[in-house]
Amino acid sequence: MKTFYLTDAGKVRSHNEDSVTILKNDAGEYLLIVADGMGGHRAGEVASSMVVTHLGKRFNDLVTVGTKYDATNWLKDNISEINHHIVEYASNNPESKGMGTTVVVALLTHDFLLYANVGDSSGFAMKNGHLLKVTKDHTLVQLLVQAGDLTEEEAKYHPKKNVLMKALGGEEDVVPDIYEVDMSFDAVLLSSDGLTNMLSNEAIEKVLNDPELSIEDKVVKLIRKCNARGGTDNISVAYLVKESGE
């Protein structure tokens, strides 16, 4: 596997409230995390960092994530646990009231690939040159799409497309959605909405399919393209690619 991750404040925000990492354990399992924080007085920065630190530590404490059943429970339990920590932190630090964060995670073992998400950070898989969105956003417009009141195209330009229905820190009990992707995937991409609000899936796919670019150059180019279009938000990308024979 080849991996690379990068985060950028963008062109408008004075500081970066995203956090991102990719970890590999001794069993050859990978954990990719992107978290997009929110809240004043740098509270969002704290929230997203808490998520990445907590999940990273829990992952590093494991010898292996075990079976698919074990891994699913591990994702649910640890995302629920860090949600409680964020809620508690906000209650003990009044200046951080309203703090929260999205999270999207990919957990890859030799036998399965799982995604978990809360909020509107996105998890994608690449298969045969096609970029497929795996996760569903916890937003008002996504609910309207699922109800048949909006088309996917209308949702892209809806004035309330960034209104979250669920995030870590928002309420006492939060359970992530879990998705599985079969092992025929070619690559995994996670991103904050700073990428997906600026670039269409087709534009992202085009960059990822460029044979002239290294994995690092692809991630850098995605972020540069977002900034060239205004860079209105922090932008974070975590990218994992299968090498030939894997």
Residues covered by each model-derived region:
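PP2C/PPM-type serine/threonine phosphatase catalytic domain
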Residues: M1-E246
